[in-house]
């Protein structure tokens, strides 16, 4: 289904993105991450729209492999660290939790960007940007746009309620579980 393709595809992209901005990144992990982000970023929309598109599927597959190699050498970051408890406490699919958290964490990390956000932006945005005009918040907006185009919920509350098997989850319930997550961390 398209929803599974979107969740798995964005998860693979985030594997590469987190490896690329990791403090443990190296020239080798960067090469793997850059190729992964390019392959996935340029094909995820096509693949989610048509899982029978063999060319897009192959690019997603190879991109996912390169992303796995990249994060094996450079590690993951805050997106994955925060998404695992969200998935465990709320039954939100892993890739969806990652995708919902990515723009928030990218915005938080924007002040620490040393030019890598531009590369990531150009891999996912249909409109290229150049260094002279680029601002890190452009990446945050492009992530939100991509996620919206492939059917990812806009925020954590929406993702939690979409995943709920017992009906709507109140803001208070979400807040209480998040508080419990921070205590357990």
Predicted regions and their residues:
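Carboxylate- and glycine-rich phosphate/diphosphate-binding segment that chelates Mg2+/Mn2+
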Residues: 1-74, 165-166
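Alpha-helix N-cap/helix-start motif at coil-to-helix transitions, marked by capping-box chemistry
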Residues: 4-11, 27-38, 76, 96, ...
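Short alpha-helical scaffolding segments that buttress acidic/His motifs in well-ordered protein cores
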Residues: 13-17, 60-68, 82, 102, ...
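Glycine-rich flexible loops
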Residues: 14, 20, 25, 61, ...
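Amphipathic alpha-helical interaction segments
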Residues: 31-35, 39, 59-62, 81-84, ...
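Charged/polar positions within long, soluble alpha-helices
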Residues: 45, 69-72, 76, 107, ...
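Glycine-rich phosphate/pyrophosphate-binding beta-alpha loops
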Residues: 65-98
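Gly/Pro-rich interdomain helix-loop hinge
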Residues: 86-176
């Amino acid at each position: 289904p398209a929803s599974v393709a979107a969740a798995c595809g964005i998860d693979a992209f985030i594997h590469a993105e987190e490896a690329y901005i990791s403090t443990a990144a190296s020239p080798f992990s960067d090469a793997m991450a850059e190729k992964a982000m390019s392959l996935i970023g340029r094909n995820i929309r096509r693949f989610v729209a048509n899982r029978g598109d063999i060319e897009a599927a192959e690019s997603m597959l190879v991109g996912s492999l390169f992303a796995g190699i990249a994060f094996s050498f450079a590690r993951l970051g805050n997106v994955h660290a925060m998404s695992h408890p969200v998935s465990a406490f709320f039954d939100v699919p892993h890739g969806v939790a990652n995708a919902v958290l990515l723009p928030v964490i990218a915005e938080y990390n924007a002040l620490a960007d040393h030019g890598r956000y531009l590369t990531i932006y150009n891999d996912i945005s249909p409109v290229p940007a150049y260094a002279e005009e680029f601002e890190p918040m452009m990446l945050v907006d492009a992530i939100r746009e991509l996620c919206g185009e492939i059917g990812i919920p806009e925020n954590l509350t929406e993702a939690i309620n979409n995943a709920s098997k017992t009906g709507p989850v109140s803001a208070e319930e979400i807040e209480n579980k998040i508080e419990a997550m921070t205590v357990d961390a």
